[in-house]
């Protein structure tokens, strides 16, 4: 606890900024409630949770809102896709920082603090944490997305044992939208996600547009987020296509 307090004092101007956590939901079932439950155990107090529901028919968003009435629930009248669904949340967000988070994730209690500390140290950009599997917390899911020689995106380190090889901050090819973190001004500068894509490759597109205007993608390894080996939207595959 003392170490955490010292770290927080290192944040610029000793101001604890508001963080908006945006979770896009579409029939995620109990995964959504479990995700929010893990967020509630975060060692950071100044945040808001915005759940954007893309016209689910499994009542997962209603059950989550019932258990956590303090969340801000936005119910879209139709499935507007991953990109525009998250854009709805970004437009409603009040935070200095924004986190885009998938509903099938669980978070480490220090994740927000470590993301902010990395951002304050390394500057503007699009950030991702270290992803470990929910099954054993020791197998890597991603330590940064990279662009293959032939143009394909891949998740570096996926399936490898976390032996400490990827424990340093790095500039990466692009940040995963499983959990993507930046200041609200950066998302707005990039005109948010491109709704033309609907879903998939949206993270590569956003970060590519960022790189073109000198907004790099960063890997923040001290921030930890857990993700299933086979995610809610993806099957186990090292490649992003």
Model-derived regions: residue spans:
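Acidic helix N-cap motif at the loop->helix transition within catalytic regions
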Residues: 33, 58-66
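Glycine-rich, basic loop-to-helix element that forms the pyrophosphate-binding segment
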Residues: 75-93, 103
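Conserved donor NDP-sugar-binding/catalytic core segment of glycosyltransferases
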Residues: 105-152
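Active-site-adjacent helix/loop segment of glycosyltransferases
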Residues: 213-241
């Amino acid at each position: 606890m003392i170490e955490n307090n010292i770290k927080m004092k290192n944040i610029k101007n000793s101001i604890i900024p508001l963080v908006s956590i945006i979770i896009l939901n579409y029939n995620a079932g109990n995964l959504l409630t479990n995700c929010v439950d893990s967020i509630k155990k975060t060692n950071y107090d100044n945040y808001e949770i915005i759940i954007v529901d893309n016209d689910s028919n499994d009542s997962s968003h209603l059950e989550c809102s019932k258990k956590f009435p303090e969340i801000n629930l936005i119910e879209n009248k139709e499935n507007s896709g991953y990109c525009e669904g998250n854009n709805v949340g970004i437009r409603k967000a009040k935070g200095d920082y924004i986190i885009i988070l998938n509903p099938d994730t669980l978070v480490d209690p220090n994740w927000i603090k470590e993301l902010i500390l990395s951002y304050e140290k390394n500057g503007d950009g699009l950030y991702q944490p270290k992803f470990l599997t929910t099954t054993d917390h020791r197998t890597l899911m991603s330590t940064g997305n990279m662009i293959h020689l032939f143009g394909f995106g891949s998740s570096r380190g996926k399936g490898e044992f976390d032996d400490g090889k990827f424990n340093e901050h790095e500039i990466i090819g692009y940040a995963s939208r499983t959990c993507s973190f930046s200041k609200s001004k950066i998302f707005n500068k990039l005109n948010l996600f491109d709704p033309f894509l609907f879903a998939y490759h949206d993270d590569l597109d956003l970060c590519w547009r960022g790189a073109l205007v000198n907004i790099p993608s960063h890997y923040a390894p001290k921030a930890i987020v857990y993700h299933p080996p086979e995610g809610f939207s993806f099957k186990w595959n090292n490649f992003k296509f």
